[in-house]
Every structure is written in structure tokens, then in C-alpha cells.
Curated annotation (Swiss-Prot):
Pfam families: Methyltransf_4 (PF02390)
Residues annotated for S-adenosyl-L-methionine binding in this entry: E43, D68, N101, N123
Reactions the enzyme catalyzes: guanosine(46) in tRNA + S-adenosyl-L-methionine = N(7)-methylguanosine(46) in tRNA + S-adenosyl-L-homocysteine
Higher taxonomy: Bacteria, Bacillati, Bacillota, Clostridia, Eubacteriales
Protein name as annotated: tRNA (guanine-N(7)-)-methyltransferase
Organism: Clostridium botulinum (strain Hall / ATCC 3502 / NCTC 13319 / Type A)
Chain residues that bind substrate: K127, D159, T196, E197, Y198, E199
Protein EC: 2.1.1.33
Family note: Belongs to the class I-like SAM-binding methyltransferase superfamily. TrmB family.
GO molecular function, a single term: tRNA (guanine(46)-N7)-methyltransferase activity
GO biological process assignments: RNA (guanine-N7)-methylation; tRNA methylation
InterPro entries per the UniProt record, alphabetical: SAM-dependent_MTases_sf (IPR029063), tRNA_(Gua-N-7)_MeTrfase_Trmb (IPR003358), tRNA_methyltr_TrmB_bact (IPR055361)
Length: 217
């Protein structure tokens, strides 16, 4: 579904200190932007921020960058973080949001700058001619490797079985070792899961969620 253009979104996100307006200028300088030397984790396709806002609250010693394509999405992610701040009565200084096409992500982060990636319910791009747009495709995994630290983990969740099984091959072909995998996350022994908005919706529909952790060798 195509989002309706919200002309008010850009001014609102630019007014927020949670928004990185010129991310390419921060390449190699993200820790300076956060004013600390803590690890930096990415969520690719952060949507409306339900997942990353929980991470930010739970892990104040980790920096987070949430990336999505549209201002119309990021504006709600920023609002979600603000809501969480008001709920816990604490300002989160460990979160930044970026609007960009993830295909150009290596222009935004430098070598060894990122310690973890989360990919949740990304577009499965089922048509073969579109497969290279998948966020887990070897083409993009090669780009991620340009800025990932050694032994970095990528956590991947989806409800799409074809994407999940193809992604296992993508990770293996790209030099990652799959350390944990389940085809039914909510009935697995994995205890560190944080649910996204989509995930909660899918759970009420009785859909199984697939999950894997892949580590860069």
C-alpha cells in the first residue's frame, strides 16, 4: 500500500533532535554524534518505531539508529519514542532516525562502526526479478559487511517462509554462520524476543513467526 504524502512530516522530523538530517556527513562519526563510545545497533526498516523504542528503553548503554525510507513513517517512529520517554519519565539520548534508501547504506556507516543489525518483517519481494531488493539478499549483505564489526550478529524475523528459506542461503553465501533458527518463534525456547507491531498483529491471526540469528565469520 502506497503511503499518502504528509507534507507536515518533514518539518516535524527536522525539528526533532532524534533525527539525523545529513547521515552521510556522520559516516565514521556516529559515536561522536551520540557523544559516547558505546556500541551502535541498526534497525533496517524500523517502521513506526514500536520495536526500536523498546530497545532504547531497555538498553541505555547501546546506541540505536532506526532507518526507513519515508518521512511519513519516521515521523511516527519519533513520536513513539517521545511517548516512551513520557511513559518512563526519562529522555533517550541513544537513538537517531534516518530516512534513506537502504541500498546506499555503506555511504552512511564506516568500517567497524556497527555492532548489530535487526531486520524485522521486511518486504519479501517475491518476484524473482525483484529479489535483489530484499534486505537479506547477498547484494545488501555485502554492503553491510563494509561497516560491520567482526563477529557481528544480524537478527532476522519474518512471516514469509520463502523469504526465510532463501535468506538462509544468502547468509551462508555471504560468510555468515546461522547460530539460531526457528520456524515458530513464539513457541520456541528463545527468550530475548521483542515484538514488533506487525508481529503482535500476526500473532492474533495465528500466524507463525520465523527467526534466525546469523553471525559474521
Amino acid at each position: 500500500m502506497r503511503l499518502r504524502k504528509k507534507w507536515w512530516a518533514r518539518p516535524e522530523i527536522e525539528a526533532s533532535d532524534k533525527f539525523a538530517e545529513e547521515p552521510k556527513e556522520l559516516r565514521g562519526k556516529w559515536n561522536k554524534e551520540f557523544n559516547n563510545n558505546n556500541d551502535i545497533h541498526l534497525e533496517l526498516g524500523c517502521g513506526r518505531g514500536g520495536f526500536i523504542s523498546q530497545l532504547v528503553e531497555k538498553n541505555k548503554d547501546i546506541n540505536y539508529v532506526g532507518i526507513d525510507l519515508k518521512d511519513e513513517v519516521i515521523v511516527y517512529a519519533i513520536r513513539k519514542v517521545k511517548e516512551k520517554e513520557e511513559e518512563v519519565k526519562r529522555e533517550f539520548k541513544n537513538i537517531k532516525f534516518v530516512t534513506m534508501n537502504i541500498m546506499g547504506i555503506a555511504e552512511v556507516f564506516d568500517k567497524n562502526e556497527i555492532s548489530k543489525i535487526y531486520i524485522n518483517f521486511c518486504n519479501p519481494w517475491p518476484k524473482e526479478r525483484h529479489n535483489k531488493r530484499r534486505l537479506t539478499h547477498t547484494k545488501l549483505l555485502t554492503e553491510y559487511k563494509k561497516f560491520l564489526k567482526p563477529n557481528t550478529e544480524i537478527w532476522f524475523k519474518t512471516d514469509d517462509k520463502e523469504l526465510f528459506e532463501d535468506s538462509q542461503e544468502y547468509f551462508k553465501e555471504s560468510g555468515f554462520n546461522i547460530e539460531y533458527i526457528t520456524y515458530d518463534l513464539h513457541n520456541s525456547d528463545f527468550k530475548e524476543n521483542i515484538k514488533t507491531e506487525y508481529e503482535t498483529k500476526f500473532e492474533t491471526m495465528g500466524m507463525k513467526i520465523m527467526f534466525l540469528k546469523a553471525r559474521l565469520l
